A protein has these predicted regions:
Chain A
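ABC-family P-loop ATPase nucleotide-binding domain
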Residues: 1-18, 231-248
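ABC family nucleotide-binding domain
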Residues: 7-215, 221-226
Length: 248, 181, 623
């Protein structure tokens, strides 16, 4: 981390991604302006096909925009080449996917240390860091197991640990609870809350209202564009009883 | 608060009022936070009048449990009628009715009269529900795993989620109606 | 009946759904069966025309000859040959006929010839069979068929023998002498060749001999002339040799008969030299037998490669097949039906391939076995025996069945639900490889892990390259020896053997190349998801494509090393004669060449895979 850290972890201006052309032109992401402050948790909601996953891939450097700018931690990334984007994914971004995308033939700890190895860290350091991260997400006792032996919630915890491997500026999560039951979802939400408290910047794309409701900021997306933005903070406290039908 | 809840809590053993309150607090967690201290006693008094509960004076008052309220010294016991009432209550299948018709009619009326944009109403409602969801979800996240209250909170969360999904359906429907009209 | 139809229809559907794979499979098996057919056809060819010629010409069991003593200059004496005709066991004989050296000139070409003086009347033993024109008459000669073919001489032509012009009455074949240019020398020949120099009396010479004082011939052709005209055409009419053809009551005892009467060393030069007919057969069929060994070995090597190819192809589509099996079973197919469908597909391919191989091999055989007109029936097409057809078909079917049996059984045994749910074969975990790879550079890390996910495919890769390189090294060694032989001794048949080697080598390499591409492609498809994740985690496309490529190169390197050890062993096994091992730098060059070739072959699929956009793959696999 540099000394002069920009206030924003992520900023996009007029970010656009189109597919096809002419009659069949599809605007997957349409002129999106997004600013995410450091330490902020932003949820992007919308029906499937609204372009929220594409947005995530664009800001994470998995895909290149058709036009518009992306600033990641104060650095323009929208015109970077494949190689530079790969390096960026290695150092500045951590991904968490709906399908976990863990490698089934690698043990939990081997999965978590993979990004560090790809980034060229020594095997010893990568292993130590992976163990620390597994400890942090609470699955250190499963370090030697294969992912298939883990529950969905545990797998997603491992995936989060992997995303944190190289201390990214930004963690990007794509439907992180999409494959999880209610209890496991709660588990992941708690983990995100811990990350949030430790100052990690998070952008989560989801159609799970529970994640959306717990974010600092909720953005609603339709047809590739932002249509609504809400901060849900503010007191409604003491109404839980009413919500449960337990009127006093 | 329903009388049957207090009755049922007495079914296990005769209890003091403060014991009942503590049991309620434990089961409800943050949901029961707004519960008034005297509320249990109000209900108990009503139950006593109805002959479902009687009180006993302790023969050997426990000096360790010095209550502030004189009523607290009493132990409440179920009467046979009270026990019967509990048994009946347990077999009942009543369920809180969600009043969706009201909101639905609100949208229809607003649209018909041109008084307000149904989508605006939906949006406002959605934010309100999200705020509620946020509160419930945060409370749920704060509960330790396996607590009684966590289960209750999960119920709240899931119902709010269902409501939000319905609002989404409302939004979709009213958007297409607007664009086709 | 209905079930059979169902199986056939399902199998046909699936084959049509993936025509490229079916074609590759066909190609792999057809290449192997073609080579095998060639090898088997050659087996029948060797010896057969000679036998026919022997019968047609009353071929001799013993060819006995005496020549002028090259060291003393003493003239040859035909008397011992006449004595031989009366020896025990001899049932018939002809000769002795005089033999003289000469030079033929025709159409501007000159060549050495041996002239054998014969009469117009047919001899009891060795009456050359005329294939063109007529037998001897006054003032006309007859030319041996292979020699005539080589010089382009036909009946009715005019040739010059030692300056004398003479007409060619006809062209004939004989079983008493190996066809040109491997002719036995009845007169003095130079240089003395080890392999067929026995034809002259001076062959088994001692250490301290004086230089031959008589002019000698080089690779002479054979011309029959009227006995009384012989001296007119001879270069040195004084230096005559004599030859006698004998038949024995037991032709199999010819070798023993010869051994008992053979000249034993210095001082024995005046004794006749005896050549048993088996020796001539040996000479005649030498090249064919070598070609046959090469073809059979090549056929087996190609067969092994075909198995590897089929296994990779089949394994690569296992994931897809498993789902299909699930579907089949879900709608009520029994495991037997499922296995039958899977097997049917490959059996159909194998049958077509073996048919193609039989036809291809049968058509290609004459090109390799054609020995011009050296012997009667030599130019006739070699025949396919029922046994050969059966063998080739059985091998092709074996390849298909072997390569599909395990997957078919496994697929059929998989539980229906698991088969429906399972989208892919789960990768295997090779713990030590994962641990080792984490200590290596990123590219190697990716390569070893990719290879480790499918250890059996990696082993097949090793096996495939081992087989190819073994074949390649053996072929190179054989080629080198052949070149050396050809340099000393040009022979169209040996050149053709060289062509056979080249064809087999090229087929072997081509099949191995196909294997490599197929294997790379299967790997690329297989690790598509893992590749996408790896790239999402920060591997560059260059690292990934290098890794995918290396995942093939590493087993190929292992295979090349094994093959360069196995190659000489294979060559040793195929060629029973003294083997000149190829020099070490050859093997190093072959290994390096294989590594480069595999890198190049895998480059395109690996690059394509590594540059594919990542996002859609990660999206598509959310389920």
């Amino acid at each position: 981390m540099t000394t002069a850290e920009p206030r924003l972890a992520l900023a996009t201006r007029g970010l656009t991604k189109t597919y096809g052309d002419g009659e069949s032109l599809v605007r997957a992401v349409d002129a999106v302006d997004l600013e995410v402050a450091r330490g902020e948790t932003v949820a992007v909601m919308g029906p499937s096909g609204c372009g929220k996953s594409t947005l995530l891939h664009l800001v994470g450097g998995l895909d290149r925009p058709s036009s518009g700018e992306i600033d990641l931690a104060g650095r323009r990334i929208d015109r970077l080449g494949e190689r530079a984007l790969a390096r960026l994914r290695r150092t500045d971004v951590g991904f968490v996917f709906q399908a976990f995308h863990l490698m089934d033939e690698l043990t939990v700890v081997e999965n978590v240390e993979l990004p560090a190895l790809l980034a060229g860290h020594s095997p010893r350091r990568a292993r130590a860091r992976a163990m620390a991260l597994l400890d942090r997400v609470g699955v250190e006792h499963k370090a030697g197991s294969l992912p298939t032996a883990l529950s969905g919630g545990q797998r997603q915890r491992v995936a989060v640990a992997r995303a944190l491997s190289n201390e990214p500026v930004l963690v990007l999560a794509d439907e992180p609870t999409g494959n999880l039951d209610s209890a496991a979802t709660l588990d992941v939400l708690r983990l995100f809350e811990e990350l949030h408290e430790s100052g990690q910047t998070l952008v989560i794309v989801t159609h799970d209202e529970r994640i959306a409701a717990t974010a600092d900021r909720l953005i609603t997306m339709r047809d590739g564009a932002f249509v609504d933005e809400t901060r849900l903070t503010g007191g409604t406290s003491g109404r839980l009883g009413a919500l449960a039908g337990f009127e006093s | 608060m329903q009388q049957e809840v207090v009755l049922a809590l007495l079914a296990k053993e005769p209890s003091h009022g403060y014991q009942l309150r503590a049991r309620l607090r434990q089961a409800l967690g943050p949901v029961g936070e707004a519960m008034n201290a005297g509320q249990v006693y109000v209900v108990l008094t009503r139950l006593e009048k109805a002959g479902l509960v009687t009180t006993e004076r302790p023969e050997r008052p426990n000096p360790a449990k010095t209550a502030k309220d004189p009523a607290d010294r009493k132990t409440y016991v179920l009467t046979p009628q009270g026990q019967q009432r509990v048994a009946e209550w347990l077999t009942e299948v009543s369920w809180p009715k969600p009043d969706l018709a009201e909101f639905h009619l609100k949208l229809v009326a607003a649209a018909a009269a041109g008084l307000a944009d149904p989508l605006g109403i939906v949006d406002t409602q959605r934010r309100e529900l999200l705020r509620r969801l946020r509160e419930a979800q945060r409370a749920a996240m704060a509960e330790p795993d396996g607590s009684d209250a966590a289960l209750l909170l999960e119920g709240i969360v899931l119902r709010l989620q269902a409501d939000l999904r319905w609002l989404e359906a409302c939004e979709r429907s009213w958007t297409t109606r607007r664009s086709t009209s | 009946m209905g079930r059979l139809l169902l199986v056939a229809r399902l199998a046909a559907r699936d084959l049509r759904r993936r025509p490229a794979e079916a074609a590759l499979l066909l190609l792999a098996i057809a290449a192997a069966t073609t080579t095998l057919t060639l090898g088997l056809v050659m087996h029948g060819v060797a010896g057969d025309p000679y036998q026919r010629t022997r019968e047609a010409t009353s071929g001799p069991d013993i060819v006995a000859s005496v020549a002028l003593n090259p060291f003393t200059g003493a003239a040859a004496d035909p008397a011992p040959l006449e004595d031989l005709a009366g020896a025990d066991g001899v049932t018939a004989g002809s000769g002795p006929f005089p033999v003289a050296g000469s030079e033929i000139e025709v159409g501007g070409q000159t060549a050495d010839v041996q002239l054998i003086g014969r009469s117009v009347e047919p001899a009891d033993v060795d009456q050359p069979a005329v294939t063109d024109g007529d037998w001897l008459r006054d003032g006309a000669v007859v030319v041996e068929a292979a020699f005539a073919g080589a010089l382009g001489i036909e009946a009715g032509d005019t040739v010059t023998l030692d300056g004398e012009t003479v007409e060619v009455a006809g062209v004939a074949v004989t079983a008493a002498m190996t066809p040109y240019p491997w002719s036995n020398c009845l007169v003095l020949c130079a240089p003395f060749r080890d392999d067929d120099g026995e034809g002259e009396g001076a062959a088994g010479g001692g250490p301290a001999r004086p230089e031959p004082q008589v002019e000698s011939l080089t690779d002479p052709g054979l011309v029959w002339v009227m006995e009384d005209e012989l001296t007119a055409f001879a270069s040195s009419p004084d230096a005559l040799s004599y030859v006698t053809y004998l038949q024995l009551d037991d032709p199999d005892s010819a070798q023993a008969f010869a051994d008992a009467r053979q000249p034993q060393g210095p001082g024995d030069e005046d004794k006749p030299f005896l050549e048993p007919w088996q020796h001539i057969v040996e000479q005649v069929t030498h090249v064919e037998r070598n070609a046959q060994r090469v073809l059979l070995t090549g056929g087996w090597l190609l067969g092994i490669l075909a198995v590897a190819s089929v296994a990779v192809l089949v394994g690569g589509r296992m994931a897809d097949q498993t789902r299909r099996v699930g579907l089949l079973k879900a709608v009520g197919g029994t495991p037997a039906l499922v296995a039958a469908v899977l097997l049917a597909e490959y059996v159909v391919v194998a049958l077509v391939a073996s048919a193609a191989g039989l036809v291809g091999g049968r058509l290609a055989a004459p090109a390799i076995t054609d020995r011009a007109a050296g012997l009667l029936g030599g130019a006739a097409a070699p025949s396919l025996t029922a046994g050969a057809v059966l063998t080739v078909t059985a091998v092709a079917l074996g390849v298909a069945v072997l390569a599909t049996f395990v997957p078919a059984i496994r697929a059929a045994r998989t539980s229906t639900v698991a088969a429906l749910n399972e989208s892919a074969r789960p990768p295997r975990r090779v713990g030590w490889l994962v641990a080792l790879s984490s200590r290596l550079p990123v590219v190697l890390l990716i390569a070893l892990r990719v290879a480790g996910r499918r250890p059996r495919r990696a082993l097949l890769g090793v096996a495939s390259v081992t087989v190819t390189v073994s074949g390649l090294v053996a072929a190179l060694a054989a080629h080198a020896e052949l070149d050396a032989q050809l340099a000393a001794n040009p022979d169209p048949r040996m050149e053709r053997l060289g062509d056979v080697l080249v064809v087999i080598t090229v087929t072997l390499v081509a099949l191995a190349a196909v294997n490599t591409v197929v294997s790379t492609w299967a790997t690329v498809l297989d690790v598509r998801h893992a590749s996408a994740v790896t790239r999402a985690l920060g591997a560059t496309p260059a690292q990934l494509s290098a890794g995918l490529s290396l995942a093939q190169v590493v087993p190929a390197f292992a295979g090349a090393v094994l093959g360069s050890i196995g190659g000489p062993l294979l060559y040793d096994a195929v060629d029973q004669e003294d083997v000149v091992m190829p020099p070490g730098w050859w093997l190093v060059a072959v290994v390096a060449g294989v590594v480069v070739a595999v890198s190049v072959l895998t480059l395109v699929p690996a690059r394509l895979a590594a540059r594919r956009p990542v996002a859609p793959i990660l999206q598509a696999e959310t389920a």
